[in-house]
Amino acid sequence: LKLVEFEYKRNHEIINIMIIEEPEAHIHTHIQRALFDNLRVSLNYTQVLMTTHSTHLSEVADINKVNVISISSNSYISEVMKPTNQLDSFGKTKLELKDLKLSDCLKRYLDAKRSVLLFSKGVILVEGDGEEILIPAMVKKAFGISLDEIGIGLINIGSVSFEYIASIFSNERLHRYCSILTDLDSFVEGSTKCSEEAAKRGVTRKDKLDTLYGENSWVDSFYATYTLEVDFVNEIENRKYVENVVRNHYSRQTTIDKHIENINDSFVNRYDSVLTVAKDMGKGWYATVLSSMLDNDLVIPDYILKALVFASQKVLTEPVLRKIGIYVLDMYDEDETISELKKKFNIGDINETIKEFSDKLPDDLLTKFFKCRMELM
C-alpha cells in the first residue's frame, strides 16, 4: 500500500527517491523476498534504495545492482564497492568467456549460503566437504575462536571453478582478502590410489590461478601438496586422531591394525591407507568424525595456516589477538613464564607481547601463525 501511495503522490518535476532501511528487522524472510521481487516503481522517475544485511535479499537481488558499503581501516571513512565493476570485461579477457557474462553467471550462483561472499570481512574458498567441515574445527580447537567471530566466511564452492568466484575480489570490485585452498594432487610413486591425470590437473590448476591472480593483492592461492587428508596426517602430531577415526569406523581388528600400521609406516603406505579410509567413510563424514577427535596437540598444515593468515589480515584486531594468546597459554602448565605472558596479553603492548611469546615458545603453533602474519605486514 505504501508503494501505491508513493506512486500516487510522486512529483514528476523532481527526482523521486524511496529508501527502505533494513527490512529484515521488521518482516519475515519470505515476505522480504516477496517485497523485493515485487518492488516495481517506474524507473523513469524513481530510484529505490534498500539497505540490508540479509543474505536472503542478496540472494534474489540482481548482483549488478548491489553495492557493498564498508568502513575503512581508519574507521572514519566509508568506501562503496561494486562487486560487478568491470567484471564482465575480466570474464571476457582473462577467463575467455565468449558468449556468457560473468556477472550473469554469478547472479545465478549466489544463493543464500554463498552470498556470505558479499558480507564477510575475509573469505576462504575451498573445494570440498572435508575442508568445509574440518578447517573451522581446527581453528576453533587450536586458537579458541571461530571463523564467524572474526568475520571470515568459508565457502565450499563444490564443482564451480575458483576463478569465477574469486574474480569479485580486486581493486575494482570488493576489497576483501580471499584465500583459495585447493589440492595439487602431486603424484606419488608406488601408490595405488594416486592418479597421474589428477597430478597433471593439479599443476594446470596452479598455473592458471597463479597467472590470473599473481598481481591481485586481494587474492592468493594456497596448495595442499597432496590432499587435505594426506597433508593432515603427514603431521606426526595429527596421526593419533586418524588412528582414532580408524578405531571408531572399522569393526574388524585386523583391518584396524593394518591401517594404523600403515599410518605410521612409509609415506606411500600412509597415503594409500588414509585415502582408503576417507573413501570408505565418505570425505564429509570422515572430516566430521575427525573433527570430534581433535585436541590441543593439533597441528594445522602450513598451507591452511597461511590461508587463514591471508584472509584474516584486516580483521585480526588487538582484542582478538589477546584472546587467542590467553587461550593458547591456558593449555600450558602454569609457571612463571606462562603467568608473565598471560599478564602481558591482558595489559601489555600487543606487538611486544607477540614477540616475547614467539621467542619463549618457538615451537608453538601460534608462533608459526604470528610469523606468517608478520611476513604479510
Would you name each region that the model predicts?
Residues I14-I17, N44-L49:
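Loop/turn-to-beta-strand initiation segments
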Residues S72-M377:
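Acidic, divalent-metal-binding catalytic cores of TOPRIM
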Residues T51-S54:
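H-loop (His-switch) motif in ABC-type P-loop NTPases
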Residues L1-M18:
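GG-anchored amphipathic helix commonly corresponding to the ABC/SMC/Rad50 NBD signature/C-loop
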Residues A34-L35:
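Conserved hydrophobic alpha-helix in the ABC-type ATPase nucleotide-binding domain
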Residues Q47, V60-V68:
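Conserved catalytic segment of ABC-fold P-loop ATPases
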